[in-house]
Amino acid sequence: MRKDGARLALPLFDPRHDPGPDFAALVSRDAARTVPTSGDGSLGAQVPHGTTIAALRFAGGVVIAGDRRATEGNFIANRTIEKVFPADRFSGVGIAGAAGPAVEMVRIFQVQLEHYEKVEGKALSLEGKANQLAQMIRQNLPLAMQGLVVMPLFAGWDAERSEGRIFTFDVAGGRYEEVAYYAIGSGGRDARATLKLGWRPGLDEAGAVHLAVQALYEAAQEDAATGGPDALRGIFPVVAVIDREGYRRIDDARLEEIAVELDQAVRERGARR
């Protein structure tokens, strides 16, 4: 019922053109003008880029974390951008690459999962969600060829397996599962090195959160495009835990405590010159 009292009609589709639970197909069919199209020229250096995202499994789920810095070439475009989002109640996605298209992709992905659940009456499986995201990355390939690369890291709780899982993607939409941890973005290599040294089977939630923050902290020491914890400005990474209870974000007070511990460890061992 609309505000003017008129009833909303149930949309009917020809069986040959019924989009079903695919929200992207519905938009393309009935609102094609709202679907982004590719332009001409290389745009990669002109837009803000998100940098480092890390994820790791622990005994009861998965942790996903992202720094807060966005860059335009050699400049810091934003110090407080958020790159980790809930996809739905039991999954989350972190973004690296061109910030604008990446955030827009996440929003469409969130709506797609909600649309599917409303149409089908049940949530998509975790692998199904990863496949859906892979398809969206594949559709972004024309923009990626112009420099607007979107590179997500997807993680969530698999109720069928009763475990956390991590999925990575390539620019063409290839989907790959990581068994323990992974990191993407400009600081991804340094973050992965820290995760490799610190991860172990049976890691608990507190240890996983600490290791995720440490991975971003160490990446920021080596990669200028990755922002480390900034207590002066009150800026800390976005860190989320996803387990059988769902997605929840770790509060900044806990992250500040971890950052202080990491600073103290650097002072004790001596800063690298």
Curated annotation (Swiss-Prot):
InterPro entries: Ntn_hydrolases_N (IPR029055), Proteasome_sua/b (IPR001353), Proteasome_suB-type (IPR023333), PSB_actinobac (IPR022483). It catalyses: Cleavage of peptide bonds with very broad specificity. CDD domains: proteasome_protease_HslV (cd01906). GO terms for cellular component: cytoplasm; proteasome core complex, beta-subunit complex. One of its GO terms (biological process) is proteasomal protein catabolic process. The 20S proteasome core is composed of 14 alpha and 14 beta subunits that assemble into four stacked heptameric rings, resulting in a barrel-shaped structure. The two inner rings, each composed of seven catalytic beta subunits, are sandwiched by two outer rings, each composed of seven alpha subunits. The catalytic chamber with the active sites is on the inside of the barrel. Has a gated structure, the ends of the cylinder being occluded by the N-termini of the alpha-subunits. Is capped by the proteasome-associated ATPase, ARC. GO terms for molecular function: threonine-type endopeptidase activity. Pfam families: Proteasome. The formation of the proteasomal ATPase ARC-20S proteasome complex, likely via the docking of the C-termini of ARC into the intersubunit pockets in the alpha-rings, may trigger opening of the gate for substrate entry. Interconversion between the open-gate and close-gate conformations leads to a dynamic regulation of the 20S proteasome proteolysis activity. It comes from Acidimicrobium ferrooxidans (strain DSM 10331 / JCM 15462 / NBRC 103882 / ICP). Residues 1-50 form a propeptide. PROSITE patterns: PROTEASOME_BETA_2 (PS51476). Its EC number is 3.4.25.1. Component of the proteasome core, a large protease complex with broad specificity involved in protein degradation. This is Proteasome subunit beta.
